[in-house]
């Protein structure tokens, strides 16, 4: 990754803003919109919903996320979990990712945190980027939180750390596509 100096920062911010704005209204044949309880998300064709067998290969615990999307290699994926009435977003008035970060720090002090923030799109999404470890492997993570009628949703995009430059734009495109999808009781 190339270092930027003070003169380049405005250009860098404009590029990032352009990437986020492009992804917002994505409608093409490279993927599909998937609708879940209270929201929809654009998912590239390379990802598919995991069945129980695939999920158990990645997540050994019985307590798995509600929604799991994997590539065929299963080294890249996105998980989404409804937190229900836990109320992480809006509780305490602070940045909700701060409490998630504190929890992550207690689990593994080897994690390396890069950046965190909040999007200002259709759905307010709080996020944090960090590197974690699975055994000896380094893993890039983009963890995010947003709110729907069903409650708070916790999502994570992960990939092998050495491939994050390839997958990070795809992860952001998926996250930026999240839209509210009111439950019409049908």
Residue ranges of model-derived segments:
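Extracellular C-type lectin-like domains
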Residues: 141-145
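N-terminal targeting sequences that direct proteins away from the cytosol to non-cytosolic compartments
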Residues: 1-125, 134-138, 148-186
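Short beta-strand/turn segments that mark the catalytic/cofactor-handling region
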Residues: 128
């Amino acid at each position: 990754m190339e270092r930027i100096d003070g003169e380049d920062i405005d250009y860098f911010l404009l590029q990032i803003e352009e990437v986020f704005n492009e992804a917002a209204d994505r409608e093409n044949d490279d993927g599909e919109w998937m609708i879940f309880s209270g929201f929809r998300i654009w998912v590239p064709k390379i990802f598919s919903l995991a069945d129980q067998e695939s999920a158990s290969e990645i997540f050994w615990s019985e307590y798995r996320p509600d929604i799991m999307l994997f590539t065929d290699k299963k080294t890249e994926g996105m998980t989404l979990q409804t937190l229900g009435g836990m109320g992480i977003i809006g509780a305490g008035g602070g940045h909700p990712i701060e409490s998630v970060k504190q929890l992550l720090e207690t689990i593994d002090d080897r994690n390396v945190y890069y950046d965190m923030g909040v999007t200002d799109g259709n759905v307010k999404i709080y996020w944090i980027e960090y590197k974690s470890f699975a055994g000896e492997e380094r893993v890039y993570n983009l963890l995010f939180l947003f709110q729907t009628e069903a409650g708070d949703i916790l999502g994570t995009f992960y990939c092998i750390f050495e491939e994050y430059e390839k997958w990070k734009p795809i992860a952001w495109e998926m996250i930026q596509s999240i839209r509210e999808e009111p439950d019409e009781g049908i």
